[in-house]
Amino acid sequence: MERNQRKTLVGRVVSDKMDKTITVIVETKRNHPVYGKRINYSKKYKAHDEKNLAKEGDIVRIMETRPLSATKRFRLVEIVEEAVII
């Protein structure tokens, strides 16, 4: 599979406590099959962050890759928007 055909997702970093690993929550909206109401869905992914660049609250883009551990199947591509620290 070529790199441009791999899944890419955009989500928010909810945890950066592990070394070289971030937890990203990806939120999507889908229509209910019967009632048609828009429902929010969310799913958490663990992603590889080689240089520990992403911090909690950042909006990041992750890409599917080969299995890096028992739970990691994605890697950090870029930080789309950095979190505002107050």
From Swiss-Prot:
One of its GO terms (cellular component) is cytosolic small ribosomal subunit. One of its GO terms (molecular function) is rRNA binding. Keywords: Ribonucleoprotein, Ribosomal protein, RNA-binding, rRNA-binding. It holds the Pfam family Ribosomal_S17. PANTHER family: 40S RIBOSOMAL PROTEIN S11 FAMILY MEMBER (PTHR10744), SMALL RIBOSOMAL SUBUNIT PROTEIN US17M (PTHR10744:SF1). Belongs to the universal ribosomal protein uS17 family. One of the primary rRNA binding proteins, it binds specifically to the 5'-end of 16S ribosomal RNA. Part of the 30S ribosomal subunit. This is Small ribosomal subunit protein uS17.
